[in-house]
Amino acid sequence: IDDVIRFAPASRQTLLFSATWPEAIAAISGRVQRDPLAIEIDSTDALPPIEQQFYETSSKGKIPLLQRLLSLHQPSSCVVFCNTKKDCQSVCDVLNEVGQSALSLHGDLEQRDRDQTLVRFANGSARVLVATDVAARGLDIKSLELVVNFELAWDPEVHVHRIGRTARAGNSGLAISFCAPEEAQRANI
């Protein structure tokens, strides 16, 4: 952002939009905007029609549960979120081994490969995209039927970003979260 601002004229209108407003975004706003007008929407007013389901399972039970849910729901498009690049690739590999068409999207991929993965997913070459949070930032898929949190997010705002990938453009969506005993504290259980 700073590189872009450096090339912008001194006299300009700068608009900044964010679904959440963590300290990092507030700091950017302070650097690039003068006397900004903040418009906040009450989070309950902004909620899209997302059905959330929660499944308690062991860590080893997550893959079989994911397979059962993909077979049950038969989504034409689904994003599965993992917390690490290693888990992301591992889940993708297992899904492909059992005949699910899956692609992985994480930070170890070159930008060219990430772009190619997104194009392949968008054109329906694969039904499942297994992704890390960072790689999926800004991901906008118009008709994403299902989001699965294979692992619970460390931060509640990340959870909101994840499930917000579904239920876009007036569509409803389904978000499923898995929780192993070691993740229970993050689920406020």
Segments and roles (model prediction):
Residues I1-I189:
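Conserved helicase RecA-like core
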